[in-house]
Each structure stands twice: as structure tokens, then as C-alpha cells.
A protein has these predicted regions:
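SAM-dependent transferase fold signal centered on methyltransferase-like domains
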Residues: 1-442
Length: 442
């Protein structure tokens, strides 16, 4: 990047990139496409990656990579997850390891490097970032230096071929095939780890060659269903990052040794699905329920996270906790609850009902009610001020004086738009209306 481009970026960092795009002929010495990427990227980073945005000299990728990269909050979550898996104390982070230490963490699909940077900094172990696109590797080298990562190795190459280069955890052989078509920044011997990796992170692409989104785990690139056994033979843990649109039940049926499912939401919008795999004997991997009781060590555990809220249950909980259905009269019910997006995705409604002593309005409503207020319910809570049938006169009486409301439908024959039109209400205000079908189909 020449000085003219640097000056242009600094002088126009708050300007509209759509207007700046017309100034190319006025600034022939400026690398305009690159400059616009930097200005646009830093604006996005102020919201998505505030720590990165606060640093001078961070290089941002083209717009699509910025849209697809993790946010700071989700990257921090993954970093803490990795630290827990590796049994690191809560206070340890960013420990610079000696050069002779073997690689313990590898990100096989580095991308913009957000997840890698936070995980590597938290673990403090020698870590490798692998990415096929050279321009992302160049940006990663610059950015990791500015972020103070002293333990990062950047590799421009194919993640699968790099995976093949690592020895299995129990293989003490001293030699492997050096005839790989990859140029490494460090001697290939660094890959000949005898003890095996501690952690592999992989984020397979969820689009096909035509750019269309795929819904099956096997259609992602690389295909982790094919790679899983090799990854598990070479690392204690594997974290797979997936689209929240994927069916996690189907995904775990296509994989072996899935130990944890993490459904991560930000501002009640489901952002990521993480699967933790391990072939280790995980009898010591215990998680506490809401009341502090350790349950079903070693069983598949589901983490439903929305910002600071976290709800943990496991497969046995889900199998042994039928949903409690509310009586259709609802006369004594005073409070209504809407589970957050992660819980909706997880579908652990029986556990939710049992743990908080709440009743679901009907099997398919996914709305809960209770007589007494429930503190710290993982979702939105409302005080019920009126319950009405869909009778026109009854609705008119309850809606008297209300001109606008926030409307949601659950298991209801009309859409929100249709219901709003029928009720003649504007959007917004402090009133919330939930339209649903009760257990008696009323």
C-alpha cells in the first residue's frame, strides 16, 4: 500500500464509499478498490469487531469476507470454549510459548482470521492458520502482528493437505512424506508433532460452486464427514463451525464422537452452530445444570447461548423430560414467555418446561406460561393483561384504545401481516400480541 492510498483511507475513513467510488479518476495514484475495502471494512468492524477497529493498520478483506466473518462476541465465545476443552485456568491467556514448542492448535480454514486470532490468543500455544487464498494470508500476517499474536504461523495452502502432514496422536514416527505441493513459512518439521494436536478448528464453506447455499453437512467444503476420523486421530478435540440453518440433529447423525452442540445467538438472532468432537474418554467432561447439579457426564450436551444467557441440557434430559401443557382455560396464568432463538433451534422444550416449572400453551406453540414470575428465563418475559378468543366482539373490547402493537404468531392460521390488517393495528408501541392455538385447538 503506497502513501497516497494510506492518506486517502485516513482522510476519508468516515465518508460514504458509494460516493468515493466515483473519485477514481481524481486520485490515479490511489489503489481505489483496496482503499474502499478498508474504509468499508473499518466501518463494519466498529460494530462487529470493535477491538480490531480500534487498532491502526488492520487490513480488511473485501466486503463478502467481512460479512461472513465472526463477530467479536462469537469469537470470544469460541475462545473460551477452546480454553475449557483444553482445561486452561480462567485467568490464563496470551502466553507466549517458546519456539521449540510443537503446534497445538490449527485452524484449517483460516478466512479473515477472526476466530483464529481470538482462540490462539486465549490458548497461548503455538498455533497455525491455514488459508488457500494468498491475499487473506497476507492480511492475516499483518493483522496478527498488530494484534500482538506472537505464537501464530500463517500458511498459504490447502487445509486438507496440511492436515495430512500431521502425525496421529500416538504415532512417534520421525518422518513423513515431504513431497507436498505447499510452500511453508516454517520448516515442515514443525508439523511432525509427536504428541498430536490439542485442537483443530474447521469452518467448511456452506455454498456450492454456483454460490448457492447448501443444507447438508456432506455438501459443505471440505466434507467433514470424510475428514472426521483423520482429524480425531490427530487432535484431542475438533470444533466444527456450521451455519445455524443446518439441522443439528441431522448433522450429528452424520458424524461420530460429537460431544457438544453449541447454538449461538446474538441479540436473539441465531448466528452460529458449533459441534465439538472428541474420541477421548470424556467421563471428566461435566457441565452443571441451572441448579448446579452435575448430570450425565460424557453424554451429548447442548448449549443454548444468547448474549449473556446460557442454557445447558443434555440428550438424556431431552429424552426424559416431556413437555408440560397448560390447561386451555389459562385462568390462573399471569406470565407468558418466549424462548430465545437458540432454544427454539435446540428444541429442548421439555427440559425448559421441567426446569422452570412452566407450561407450554400447546405442543406446537413454543410459548410458555406460568402463574408466578420466573426469574432469569432464557428468553423474553411478559405480564399477561388480557386473553381473548378470535371472536370479533371480544377482540374489539380487549383492543379498545390500542392503535399499534407488536404482533407475533405461533401455530396460528394467519400470518403477522394478515393479522395486523385484520386487527387494523400499526406496528410498534408497548403492547405485545401473541396469536396462537391452544391445546384444545381453540
Amino acid at each position: 500500500m503506497n502513501q497516497a492510498t494510506q492518506d486517502f483511507i485516513r482522510q476519508h475513513q468516515d465518508d460514504d464509499v458509494r460516493q468515493l467510488a466515483f473519485l477514481g479518476s481524481k486520485y490515479p495514484e490511489v489503489d481505489m478498490p483496496f482503499a474502499l475495502d478498508q474504509i468499508r471494512g473499518r466501518k463494519m468492524a466498529r460494530v462487529k469487531l470493535p477491538r480490531w477497529a480500534s487498532l491502526e493498520g488492520i487490513i480488511y478483506p473485501p466486503h463478502i469476507s467481512m460479512e461472513q466473518c465472526s463477530s467479536e462476541s462469537t469469537a470470544l465465545y469460541k475462545a473460551e470454549l477452546a480454553a475449557r476443552l483444553l482445561d486452561l485456568p480462567a485467568s490464563s491467556s496470551g502466553i507466549e510459548m517458546k519456539a521449540e514448542n510443537e503446534i497445538e492448535f490449527v485452524d484449517l480454514t483460516g478466512g479473515f482470521g477472526v476466530d483464529f486470532s481470538y482462540i490462539a490468543a486465549r490458548l497461548g500455544v503455538k498455533s497455525m492458520y491455514v488459508e488457500r487464498q494468498a491475499h487473506l494470508c497476507e492480511a492475516a500476517k499483518e493483522n496478527f502482528e498488530r494484534l500482538g499474536l506472537k505464537n501464530a504461523i500463517v500458511k498459504n495452502g490447502d487445509g486438507i493437505e496440511v492436515l495430512h502432514s500431521f502425525l496421529p496422536k500416538k504415532d512417534d514416527a520421525a518422518s513423513t512424506d515431504d513431497s507436498l505441493g505447499i510452500t511453508y513459512d516454517q520448516p515442515l518439521s514443525l508439523l511432525k508433532t509427536k504428541l498430536g494436536l490439542k485442537l483443530i478448528f474447521i469452518d467448511p464453506a456452506r455454498r456450492d460452486d454456483a454460490g448457492n447455499k447448501v443444507v447438508s453437512l456432506k455438501d459443505c467444503t471440505p466434507d467433514v464427514t470424510v475428514l472426521q476420523e483423520e482429524m480425531l486421530s490427530k487432535a484431542d478435540y475438533v470444533i466444527i463451525k456450521l451455519s445455524p440453518m443446518l439441522d443439528w440433529h441431522r448433522a450429528i447423525s452424520e458424524l461420530s464422537h460429537v460431544r457438544e452442540v453449541h447454538i449461538i445467538s446474538v441479540n436473539n438472532e441465531c448466528k452460529e452452530l458449533l459441534l465439538v468432537l472428541s474420541a477421548r474418554n470424556l467421563g471428566d467432561m461435566e457441565a452443571s445444570s441451572a441448579d448446579g447439579e452435575v448430570k450425565h457426564a460424557g453424554n451429548l450436551r447442548i448449549y443454548c447461548v444468547n448474549d449473556a444467557q446460557s442454557f445447558v441440557c443434555d440428550e438424556l434430559d431431552m429424552e426424559s423430560s416431556p413437555v408440560k401443557i397448560a390447561p386451555s382455560t389459562l385462568e390462573e396464568m399471569q406470565y407468558l414467555y418466549e424462548p430465545n432463538a437458540s432454544l427454539m433451534k435446540a428444541g429442548c422444550f421439555g427440559v425448559l418446561s421441567d426446569r422452570y416449572d412452566a407450561r407450554m400453551l400447546s405442543k406446537n406453540s413454543h410459548l410458555f406460561v406460568s402463574q408466578a414470575p420466573i426469574e432469569a428465563f432464557p428468553g423474553r418475559s411478559f405480564r399477561i393483561i388480557a386473553i381473548s378468543s378470535f371472536n370479533k366482539k371480544e377482540l374489539k373490547r380487549h383492543l379498545s384504545g390500542i392503535t399499534k402493537a407488536n404482533i407475533a404468531t405461533r401455530n396460528f392460521p394467519l400470518s403477522v401481516a394478515e393479522l395486523r390488517k385484520r386487527l387494523k393495528l400499526k406496528d410498534g408501541g408497548e403492547t405485545y400480541i401473541f396469536a396462537t392455538t391452544l391445546s384444545d385447538e381453540s
